[in-house]
Amino acid sequence: VHTCEEFDFSKSPYWPDPESMIRKLHEKDIRLVLWQIPVYKKQGMDERVCRQLELDRENAVRKAFCVRKEDGSPYRIPEGNWFAGSMIPDFTNPETKKDWFGKRQYLLDMGVDGFKTDGGEFIYESDLLFSGGMTGAEAKNNYAQTYTGAYTQFLKEENVLFSRAGFAGAHRTPIHWGGDQQSENGELYSVLQAGLSAAMTGIPFWSFDIAGFAGPLPSPDLYRRATQLACFVPVMQWHSEPDGGQFKELMPGMDGNNERSPWNIAKAWNCPAFTDEMRFWHRLRMNLLPYLYSTALQCCREYRPMMRPLVYDWQQDPEAVRAEDEYMLGDSLLAAPLLQENQRIRSLWLPEGSWYGLFSHKKYEGGRR
């Protein structure tokens, strides 16, 4: 017997005691963030029918919890798009939010620390209707913020939101990450531009997937340079598409081996010393945490992003205006990442002032290359 109220782990053989598991994670200073997607999912032909999910979909239609078409029927994500055939919750409807988050309240109660709010770009048609009066044309950009804003209202102050999509006001729903990239050399420059663009919109905390999310496993060279870049952005993470995931046709990876962990890269490329090399950068990151923490607090108080293109702080400096591949992380660290394949050295612009090499401790006077 299933009811629309049965949304918990109680009957799952995979998670017999999630509350105890979360408590043990917290004892090790590990926080748990759960992935979310704003859909009433249409199951695939290869999935076992979930009666609980079907009940939830039927309930959403009956009570008008989902976005509608002009004729009043539920809008479904068009074929050829992610989660095709799924319906979308209408977060402008107070009853939708009450139902949606009522089914997730127990997650916060048991200690879940936040949510990774993926998706948010599912409005592909203009003639759609929302409870709050918004049309599909207006919602194509705004839905992402309606969605993440609803989650922000649901969370406690100590919880975190980790989002991909956004619109005007996205700075109020941190953290954000740059979405899914392929493991290709050209992507590293692009992802840096995405981070600096996000900073200029006021987003304070930003991240990306080290060396890409999908496609063939990155080379040690790409992974090394991506890790070095990630060490000096607000949030450092590696992440990868699961085997047989959504990009298996568009960006095929290595069969059964998509994991982007440092040790898997070392194993796949037969370079055992690579793990220790990456450990150096991860330890450096941990040693930077006091600086990053104080910088994050400062940015919240002063409404400034942590990661800033040089032009943000040196607006009258023509060289700073032209610098597309350097940035500040807080007030004291200037990062100039290696973005080209097999690159080991590069030139950079130092703004006015005295600068010190992080590793060499050598002093450099600014206002020159």
Regions found by a protein language model. Give the residues of each.
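Catalytic-domain carbohydrate-binding cleft regions of carbohydrate-active enzymes
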Residues: 1-369
